[in-house]
Amino acid sequence: MKHLLASLLVPCVILALLIAACSEDDPTGPNDLGGETNLELTQVGQEFPISISVPGTQSILSELKDSIVITANDGGIVTMRGIVGFDSAWVRGLEAELGISALPIPSKRAILETYMQRFGAVIDSTDKQAMTMRVDAKLKVTSEGMQEFVSSGGDLSRPFTIVKYDMNVGDSWEFTDADGVKITRTVVSKSTTDDYEVGFWYLKVIKVEETREDPLMEKITYVTNHKFGLVGVHMLTKTGKEIKTIVFPPTL
């Protein structure tokens, strides 16, 4: 059980991030989001394969068995379900890779519960050779940007912006999540050429960096494309490791 508690942290973070995106009440503010909502990208049934790696290493994260599927779309409010599968051997390997093996059980449990509550994850560990974790989350995706409801605890009246495609480098905004934690997001780069690799393709992207108080992560960078939405998430851990997730849009 202690290995399970420690090792589910990263998958929980990854899934919740992959099914995120944002907006606000002020019509001129960074969290206001308009645009077309009837997009091929977000039709029910669309599936988003992912690839996870830690550059410079043969990370056990690359073995993660995943499935992320759109299960509902109500006027641009999209429900995505992420499911990851793993076994006890993978769990032990991830614990060692994260360098958290020495933490006492109560500390591991507290960290895990923080993420589980934040992202509403459900774990089935009945069969230690075929464990699963499921995350269901709602987001808003339009032709103008993306919004997420994870930070508001699922409150659809409080979306928070990950990106608006007309933003520029240096644009920055802050908000407080459902737990009272201040989150800052800043546009750190905007491509003028196709320079971000997604499989066999190169895309123009906007990178938005997020900082917040977090037990494991120093910062998170969301990588988005104006046509394909979220195509990458880069997480920098407090121990200096970069966890790089590439998202393969079904319409690419």
Located regions from the model:
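Conserved functional acidic sites
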Residues: 23-252
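Bacterial N-terminal signal peptides that target proteins for export
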Residues: 1-10
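C-terminal motif of bacterial Sec signal peptides marking the signal peptidase cleavage site
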Residues: 18-21
